[in-house]
Amino acid sequence: WDGTDSYYLPFESETYTAYTSSNIDFDTNILRYGYQSLTTPSSIIDFDMVTKSKTIKKEQEVLGGNFKKENYTSERVWATALDGTKVPISIVRHINTKKTADTPLLLYAYGSYGSTIDPYFSTVRMSLLDRGFIFAIAHVRGGEYLGRQWYEDGKLFKKKNTFLDFIACSKYLIKNNYTSAKH
């Protein structure tokens, strides 16, 4: 460390997956990392720590040739569980899909064994989004999305929190007009 101020990498979305990657040159100013979000295909990026510039080295191809990430939008919202705990929800939709009671929504969750459902890019999911669906991931307790305690608070005698979190997320999405109970 050279004593300079901290710097945070600028990510395009508030809900994403990022990880450091390998670089065979250990004496370099380049940080290589992987990045993807609900709207951005998996990418390998070189970040120059001196100039603060980035270069996309590789991005997952989306077959069909019609994909444009600017046609989709994602967000992170927080539902309040029965015990007052804030539960994150990652949401993605096509920009032409409005949040109304008539909009179909697929809510997905997995809260067990500490497994985390990252907000990742899926070409299969694009088919739903292009047909007017909203897709949401409820990051319920039982996974480790918010750390080890998040996992502990969703297992054994606290397992019911996983299901109560999912219900709270469903109610939040209905109350905030993303969809309705009929969907």
Predicted regions and their residues:
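Short loop/turn segments that connect beta-strands within beta-propeller blades
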Residues: 1-4, 49-50
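Coil-to-beta-strand transition motifs
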Residues: 4, 39, 84-86
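A structural motif specific to WD40 beta-propellers
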Residues: 6-7, 55
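Conserved blade-ending motifs and adjacent loop-strand segments that build the rim/top face
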Residues: 7-21, 61-68
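Structural signature of eukaryotic scaffold interfaces centered on beta-propeller domains
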Residues: 21-27
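Short beta-strand elements that form the blades of beta-propeller/WD-repeat-like
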Residues: 27-36
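Structural motif
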Residues: 39-46
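Cap/lid segment of the alpha/beta-hydrolase catalytic domain
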Residues: 49-53, 58-183
